[in-house]
Regions:
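Short acidic/polar active-site loop segments enriched in Thr and Asp
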Residues: 88-89, 144-146
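Conserved small/polar residues in nucleotide/adenosyl-binding loops
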Residues: 147-152
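Hydrophobic faces of well-ordered beta-strands that scaffold small-molecule active sites
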Residues: 58-60, 121-125
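Metal-associated gating/positioning segment near the N- to mid-region
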Residues: 51-116
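Short, acidic/polar
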Residues: 72-79, 131-140
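Active-site metal-binding motif and surrounding structural segment of the metallo-beta-lactamase
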Residues: 39-53
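N-terminal metal-binding scaffold of metallo-dependent hydrolase/deaminase domains
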Residues: 1-41
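Generic structural signal for hydrophobic
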Residues: 82, 109, 138-144
Length: 155
């Protein structure tokens, strides 16, 4: 008895063991379950002949401009655009208005992201000359890291 898959990607070029190989991928519940030659057993089959299959891309420097310039882009629209381009994870920069350089602003951003992001996400904490105490404790936050802010800031 063969497995049922939600999607089979046929004849795609994947980089495996140091070289590109044409393989099939079987997915179930958005996870790769099998790589190799796969007999068709899915309602959805995508022919990837001549195409390269890549894992999701991680963008470590996005600027979604929320808060402050939500009319340009925000967490929801930016993450939707990322996913449309094959990006599965983003690290958002802290140069917003106000900047994400205090625990209060960082926690507001985490709260704003709940149920609005369409990909995996993390936020940088902004380092300024005026927030050294916060920087010393930044590892207690859910920040991916911290980065310096090169714009005028109060915090």
């Amino acid at each position: 008895m063969s497995d049922n898959y939600s999607l089979i990607i046929k004849n795609g070029s994947c980089y495996i063991d140091g070289k590109f190989q044409n393989v099939d991928l079987a997915l179930s519940r958005n996870k790769i379950k099998k790589i190799g030659k796969i007999e068709l057993n899915s309602n959805k089959v995508f022919d990837a002949t001549g195409k390269t299959i890549l894992p999701g891309v991680i963008d470590t420097q996005v600027h979604f401009r929320e808060p402050g310039a939500n009319n340009a882009e925000n967490l929801e629209s930016g993450s939707r655009a990322a996913v449309a381009g094959g990006v599965t994870s983003v690290f958002e920069m802290p140069n917003t208005n106000p900047p994400t350089s205090t625990f209060e602003e960082f926690n507001k951003k985490l709260e704003a992201a709940q149920n609005r992001m369409f990909c995996n996400y993390a936020f940088y904490f902004g380092a300024t000359p005026n927030n050294m105490k916060e920087l010393a404790a930044v590892d207690t936050l859910k920040a991916v890291s911290y980065t310096h802010l090169t714009l005028p800031t109060k915090a």
